[in-house]
Design a protein with these regions (language model features):
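Signal peptide processing junction and immediate N-terminal pro/mature segment
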Residues: 26-34
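N-terminal secretory/targeting leader peptides
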Residues: 33-130, 150-371
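Hinge/lid segment of periplasmic solute-binding proteins
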Residues: 138-152
Length: 371
């Protein structure tokens, strides 16, 4: 027995066999490496914290999917105006968009209840209780019903930003009481929050984010509320106004969301859908903790570098807003059954959570660490 016994014999390919092999190879299916483009048009400018969060969302989705989903984040007004984002996503003009559910109030007033819960004492929900209700207390199911069945939009929604309570806003006028405030032309958010200011007797103007600073420079508005110090800085309010009024009760919850076209989303694999969902949840938490950290720093920057005077909102303004908030919730609930369902669901959940979380908030509200 020789060594050749254990060695494989060389294979000789004839021209015919080689041609056949090539034909089989050329006809075999080729695995595509093309990625799915996912454009997210935001309702905020580049440079804002929300835009930063969206870019991180895109980077993580791209990395986790090995490039199968190519997320491209576009700033406010890049393709459509901010108030048209939902409609553009619905019809597939863009794959996704970012704004706050209150921006969809033209379709149904209840959208604001999932984004900018009005006047904390009226609903009983602060930011964390709102998320507890949304994820654990049936809030998400109500929102899906609202968007997909009541409004009839072909979208899937993912909360991605949270910034908690919002200041009253910016002005060049010292405000000592509600009467002073009522004399100003005040830019409000759209939807329910704007209605509350109207109910209170404030002269309101709604402007999209693209219009805010130019309108202030032209004197179209005397005072403007946006989001918080970090986001307001990105808008440039510190270059237009001298006074920044904090401590308002009109809005204690702020949730920004990505809405994704349902056809686009349904065509993704279950694994890639899970990546989008879990990535949204991860940046949602980061946005909240980053928001607290940076807003504290930004207030100092406003005062030391820009000469902004940080003011406390007069108490009678907050009392008037509380009364107006209660009234608008009652009026809207009487007008619309779905709106009433959401308000009841939120209040019921807030009541059930109060034995635990309300006690904690009460302690925080009455005690401070010694200097």
């Amino acid at each position: 027995m020789t060594l050749s016994t254990f060695l494989p014999r060389p294979t000789v390919l004839t021209a015919t066999a080689l041609s056949a092999a090539l034909a089989v190879g050329l006809s075999a299916p080729v695995t595509s490496t093309a990625s799915e483009r996912m454009r997210i048009q935001a309702a905020v400018p580049s440079g804002s914290l929300a835009f930063e969060i969206l870019e991180e969302f895109g980077d993580r989705v791209g990395a986790a999917t090995d490039g199968r989903i190519d997320v491209q984040v576009l700033s406010a007004g890049a393709i459509v105006s901010s108030d048209q984002i939902l409609d553009a996503v619905d019809v597939g003009q863009i794959e996704a968009g970012f704004a706050w559910p209150q921006f969809w109030s033209g379709h149904h007033p209840a959208t604001a209840l999932f984004s900018n819960t009005p006047v904390w004492p009226a609903s009983g929900l602060d930011q964390l209780t709102h998320f507890s209700w949304y994820y654990e207390g049936g809030g998400k199911e109500l929102y899906d019903e609202l968007m997909q069945e009541v409004i009839g939009k072909s979208v899937v929604s993912f909360p991605v930003t949270a910034s908690g309570w919002q200041p009253l806003g910016w002005t060049n006028t010292v405000i000592e009481n509600f009467e002073d405030f009522a004399e100003l032309r005040y830019r409000t958010p759209p939807g329910l929050i704007g209605e509350i200011f109207d109910e209170a007797g404030v002269s309101t103007v709604f402007l999209g984010p693209e219009e805010l600073v130019p309108a202030a420079e032209r004197g179209v508005v005397d005072m403007a509320g946006w989001i918080n110090p970090v986001e307001d800085y990105a808008m440039g309010f510190q270059d237009v106004f001298d006074y920044y009024y904090l401590s308002s009760v009109h809005q204690f919850v702020d949730v920004g969301e990505i809405v994704v076209n349902s056809v686009f989303y349904d065509n993704l694999s279950a694994g890639d859908q899970a990546i989008i969902e879990t990535t949204a949840q991860s940046v949602l938490l980061e946005s909240y903790v980053r928001d607290i950290h940076r807003n504290s720093q930004m207030l100092t920057k406003f005062q030391e570098e820009y000469g902004v005077t940080v003011m406390t909102t007069p108490g009678d303004i907050n009392l008037r807003l509380l009364e107006a908030g209660q009234q608008r919730l009652a009026d809207r609930s009487a007008e619309d059954e779905f709106f009433a369902r959401v308000v009841k669901a939120q209040r019921d959940y807030a009541g059930s959570a109060d034995a635990w979380w309300g006690e904690v908030l009460g302690i925080y509200g009455t005690l401070r660490a010694p200097d």
